Amino acid sequence: LKLGRRKRRRARERTADQISGGWDEFVDRVVDLGAPVPPRGTRRSGALAVEDHFAVVPGTGEMTESASGGAAIALADRADAEVFGPGDPSAEDVEAFWHDVDASATELASTQSKWRQLRARVSPRSLRRKERK
C-alpha cells in the first residue's frame, strides 16, 4: 500500500503536484516513526512538529538539537517555494526534492532503534491520514 501511494505521488501529472507528493511522503514516513504531525496546517507548522519530536532524547525526555538539523523546515520551505513560486518546477527540481526527502527521512529513521524502524515500515498510521490533493 505504501509503495503504491509513493508511486502515485511521483507520477502525478504536474511537477508542482509531484513536489507536494514528496512533502506528503516525508510527512508520512516521519508519522510512521512516531512524529505527531497535525493532519491540517501549513508545511512549516508540520516541519516544526517534526523538529520538536526528533529533538527529544529517547528515554530521557530531555531536549537537544533536532536530529533533522533543520532539514524538515528546509524541505517545507522549498516545497512551498516550488509549488507556489512562479512557473512550474523542472523535472530536475522534482528529482532533487525527492532525493532530499528520502535522505532526510532515512537520516531521521537512523536515529531510532532498529525495532522502531521495523515498526515504522509496517505502521498503518500514515495510511489513516487524509491525503492532500
Which residues does each predicted region cover?
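Alpha-helical transmembrane segments
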Residues: 1-6
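Membrane-proximal, non-transmembrane interaction modules
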Residues: 14-133
